């Protein structure tokens, strides 16, 4: 996407990166405040966890155009180049190249052992397509998070912390879906809450989300990951040629319903599409969830990125009075209890609300476009049915400085829909982030996610720790039982802004509205403004 050169870009380029960041903290107490947008916020949210937190909101208040706006924006957009700079580390490059070779070898061996994965070219499967079928380059994700890698996120995780089983199962069109089921090791007889993770489009593969999956497993969750039809190691098309991926956005919600059915399946309730499609290919396919005996079917959550965030927004809507009935085949009612949408939670007006660019508003050209030839035609109307946490990026796919003063409430459409329905909701926009902060991979513009390599693992980062903090706290708040780790302090984690308020966007308001377990209503349409 191109824009005519703007004179402000020259000023931005010349602005000093050493100027004080707009998000500094000091130890003054916060009281009732007025947000930069003029909306009132409640001092009751300044909890005992962060009573002395105060932010410098000069960047929030900066007018456009101005020298201050240019200085703030120059510092902010610099975050989007951190990841690619970190990846020049020789230790990262060495591990990446080793995993490139290992993934390519595994892909070739799969094709040799089961040639049916090499479908006629018209179907799109060739051994190295779909794009991430061979799992190299950006498709590797974090190269330290694979079995066989010495380190806490490699061998230690797979041998001591988790059980991970690869699975292949059919979708409703008899395309093969490649995925994994994960659970904490030594779960014993415990019934576990479960999360289904749905990839983004543009060929994102499941490995790009293992950074979040490992954290969920460590937090006590069973997790189902897979590549949607048309992406990664799944079939590019059905046997009749029906496409997936961006050519058929329905796979991001219809496929998610299939995923939920597979999660719920057991020997007594086999996965329905297995019987329908068995024998289509010689590939060994699963009839049921291998960890069915550990699943608590009453505690299921969803997390999705990009088109997958649109998918979780749609799927949670099923069974709402103003939407469509639940289409799953193993339960009569929608079993989803909570969702997290990584860029972004959709609204009825804009179901796919992902930020694509800083050059246009996210409610218009910046939102995920719908091709009238391929856009879903039977998606359920978006309805606020279950608690939802939404994240939005600032720069989308284009790490280009803002040449406008965006409306502060621009990312709050879904928040407002959930809030009006009195359904718990939280919306977070992290400063200096791109759409690819949620699917980090080699060469992809994003904020820092591997600033240090310690014990053969990526440590630290800008947005990643914050995304994990709120994702885990939100899931724990609505899925954990009282006797499980994460239950007791979930509310406190959602309200503890000490480490994170300074990383919230100064362009766009972040907001929250939910009731704590002790009955306190928490409501703010601008979290940063609490700490003026």
Regions found by a protein language model. Give the residues of each.
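C-terminal motif of bacterial Sec signal peptides marking the signal peptidase cleavage site
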Residues: 18-21
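Bacterial signal peptide processing site
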Residues: 23-26
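Alpha/beta-hydrolase-fold serine-hydrolase catalytic core, especially in secreted/extracellular enzymes
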Residues: 38-121, 431-436, 440-532
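N-terminal cap/lid segment of alpha/beta-hydrolase-fold proteins
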Residues: 119-190
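Short substrate-entry loop that stabilizes the transition state in hydrolases
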Residues: 187-192, 197-235, 348-349, 398-401
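Alpha/beta-hydrolase active-site loop
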Residues: 245-297, 314
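Short glycine-enriched nucleophile-adjacent loop
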Residues: 264, 309-323
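The feature captures the conserved acid-bearing segment of alpha/beta-hydrolase catalytic domains
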Residues: 327-435
């Amino acid at each position: 996407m191109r824009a005519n050169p703007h004179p402000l870009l020259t000023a931005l380029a010349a602005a000093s990166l050493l100027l004080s960041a707009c998000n500094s903290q000091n130890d003054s107490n916060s009281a009732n405040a007025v947000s930069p947008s003029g909306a009132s916020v409640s001092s009751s949210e300044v909890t005992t966890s962060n009573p002395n937190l105060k932010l410098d909101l000069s960047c929030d208040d900066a007018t456009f155009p101005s020298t201050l706006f240019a200085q703030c924006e120059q510092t902010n957009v610099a975050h989007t180049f951190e990841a690619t700079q970190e990846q020049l580390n020789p230790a990262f490059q060495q591990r990446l190249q080793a995993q490139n070779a290992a993934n390519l070898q595994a892909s070739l061996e799969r094709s040799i052992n089961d040639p049916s994965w090499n479908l006629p070219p018209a179907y799109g499967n060739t051994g190295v397509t779909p794009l991430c079928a061979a799992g190299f380059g950006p498709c590797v994700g974090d190269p330290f998070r694979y079995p066989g890698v010495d380190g806490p996120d490699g061998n230690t995780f797979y041998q001591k912390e988790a059980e991970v089983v690869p699975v292949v199962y059919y979708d409703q069109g008899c395309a093969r879906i490649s995925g994994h089921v994960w659970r904490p090791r030594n779960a014993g007889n415990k019934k576990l809450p479960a999360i289904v993770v749905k990839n983004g489009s543009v060929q994102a593969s499941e490995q790009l989300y293992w950074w979040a999956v490992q954290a969920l497993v460590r937090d006590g969750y069973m997790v189902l990951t897979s590549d949607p039809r048309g992406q990664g190691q799944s079939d590019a098309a059905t046997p009749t040629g029906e496409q997936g991926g961006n050519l058929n956005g329905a796979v991001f919600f219809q496929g998610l319903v299939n995923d939920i059915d597979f999660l719920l399946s057991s020997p007594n309730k086999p996965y329905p599409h297995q019987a329908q499609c068995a024998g289509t290919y010689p590939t060994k396919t699963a009839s049921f969830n291998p960890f069915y005996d550990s699943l608590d079917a009453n505690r299921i959550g969803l997390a999705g990125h990009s088109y997958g965030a649109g998918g979780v927004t749609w799927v949670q809507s099923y069974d709402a009075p103003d939407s469509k009935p639940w289409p799953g085949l193993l339960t009569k009612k929608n079993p989803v209890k909570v969702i997290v949408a990584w860029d972004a939670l959709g609204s009825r007006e804009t179901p796919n609300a992902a930020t694509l660019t800083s050059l246009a508003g996210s409610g218009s050209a910046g939102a995920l476009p719908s091709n009238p030839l391929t856009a879903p035609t039977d998606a359920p109307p978006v309805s606020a049915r279950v608690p939802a946490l939404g994240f939005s990026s600032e720069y989308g796919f284009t790490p280009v400085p803002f040449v406008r003063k965006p409306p502060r409430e621009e990312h709050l459409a879904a928040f407002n829909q959930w809030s009006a329905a009195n359904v718990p909701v939280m919306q977070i926009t992290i400063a200096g982030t791109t759409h690819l902060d949620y699917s980090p991979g080699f060469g992809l513009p994003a904020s820092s996610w591997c600033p240090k390599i310690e014990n053969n693992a990526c440590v630290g980062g800008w947005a990643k720790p914050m995304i994990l903090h709120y994702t885990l706290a939100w899931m724990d708040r609505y899925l954990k039982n009282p006797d499980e780790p994460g239950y007791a302090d979930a509310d406190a984690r959602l309200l503890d802004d000490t480490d994170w308020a300074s990383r919230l966007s100064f362009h766009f308001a972040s907001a929250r509205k939910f009731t704590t377990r002790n009955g306190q209503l928490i409501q703010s349409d601008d979290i940063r403004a609490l700490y003026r």
